């Protein structure tokens, strides 16, 4: 009888894309894969080709809100729905990637004595994973951190989709219309873009395009028409098809420091200048992610508070100067093969070679 696994995680792309990396590899090993998510979450849009089961999920907030009361009832309902689904499926394992949909699933699995493995992408665990730690047999960590549950924790890195690693440099250059005479700088700030990065790049664009061919993923509704005619500069809101070729064409990256993005850079061995989301706009996870990558020699960091035309140019020049050093450090990383590491832990846990 085939082994069976349930994946869960959602609410944001960061809680889904590592699962997307796992799905084809699990199927290749003959494992039956199911997904539990919400009806209106991004996971419902992104997950294809495997059975998808819907439950309710309520958000647990760290601050006072009237929605906290109604969401408690959603969590209770979701727990009951998850328990019913898991009782019917009887999987060998639940792999929970985080996001609030994973909480009722992990709790229900523990109640039914189904093993649970958590994966934490960020340097510090999000609230959903904190609520599931006691229910888990193992916790896969993207970062080499000390936690209160070290006996359960395993350093794995974060799973990255294999298709992102299979791009063609020449195809990427052709798509962008670059001739390869200059280093290619990839600039990205997530699906919504990063206005602070966009503004700094725009202010330095003349000098930057003298040194680099630039592909700039500016985010939804953030294109700058004034730059359309500029040589060695291509802007997009975002790229879906052919992103792997764009990655292959890039020599350097300028980016926020969300866990998914920086582990993609690590797997690609793409040196990056990271501008973490400031504490005023986050729980500080990007700051810690970036500091870790800089300490390991995988990237350089420029805080948003210090970001301007001059500091950006200087930091990118320094990144280019030390590019080969960073590539060597990334090549020696134990976290780079997050996909293989997590697959091995799952296989070991359910007895699949």
State each model region's role.
Residues 2-10, 27-74, 305:
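Conserved nucleotide-sugar phosphate-binding/catalytic loop shared by glycosyltransferases and other
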Residues 4, 32, 110-170:
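Active-site-proximal region of nucleotide-activated glycan assembly enzymes
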Residues 20, 24, 41-50, 169-171, ...:
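Donor-nucleotide binding loops and adjacent catalytic segments primarily
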Residues 64-93, 111:
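An amphipathic, basic-hydrophobic alpha-helix
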Residues 91-93, 236, 248-263, 270-271:
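Acidic donor-binding loop of glycosyltransferase active sites
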Residues 318, 335-353:
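C-terminal alpha-helical cap of glycosyltransferases
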Residues 324-336:
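A short, well-ordered alpha-helix in the C-terminal region of glycosyltransferases
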């Amino acid at each position: 009888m085939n082994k069976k696994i349930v994946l869960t995680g959602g609410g944001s792309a960061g809680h889904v894309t590592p699962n997307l990396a796992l799905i084809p590899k699990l199927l290749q090993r003959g494992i039956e894969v199911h997904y539990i998510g919400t009806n209106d979450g991004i996971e419902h849009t992104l997950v294809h080709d495997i059975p998808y089961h819907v439950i309710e999920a309520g958000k647990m907030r760290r601050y006072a809100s009237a929605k906290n009361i109604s969401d408690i009832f959603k969590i209770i309902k979701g727990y009951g729905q998850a328990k019913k689904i898991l009782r019917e499926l009887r999987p060998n394992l639940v792999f929970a990637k985080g996001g609030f949909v994973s909480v009722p699933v992990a709790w229900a699995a523990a109640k039914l004595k189904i093993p649970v493995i958590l994966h934490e992408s960020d340097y510090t665990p999000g609230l959903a994973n904190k609520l599931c730690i006691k229910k888990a047999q193992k916790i896969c960590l993207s970062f080499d951190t000390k936690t209160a549950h070290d006996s359960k924790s395993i350093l794995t890195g974060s799973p990255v989709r294999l298709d992102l690693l299979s791009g063609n440099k020449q195809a990427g250059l052709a798509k962008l219309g670059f001739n390869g005479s200059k280093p290619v700088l990839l600039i990205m700030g997530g699906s919504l873009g990063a206005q602070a990065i966009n503004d700094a790049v725009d202010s330095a664009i003349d000098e930057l395009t003298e040194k680099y061919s630039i592909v700039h993923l500016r985010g939804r509704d953030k294109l700058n028409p004034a730059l359309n005619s500029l040589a060695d500069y291509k802007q997009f809101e975002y790229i879906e098809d052919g992103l792997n070729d764009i990655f292959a064409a890039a020599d350097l990256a300028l980016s926020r420091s969300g866990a998914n993005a920086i582990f993609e850079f690590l797997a690609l061995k793409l040196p990056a200048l990271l501008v973490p989301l400031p504490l005023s706009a986050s729980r500080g996870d990007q700051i810690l992610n970036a500091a870790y990558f800089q300490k390991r020699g995988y990237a350089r960091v420029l805080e948003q508070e210090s970001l301007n035309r001059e500091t950006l140019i200087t930091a990118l020049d320094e990144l280019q100067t030390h590019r080969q050093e960073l590539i060597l450090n990334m090549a020696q990383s134990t976290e780079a093969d997050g996909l293989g590491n997590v697959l091995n832990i799952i296989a070991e846990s359910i007895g699949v070679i």
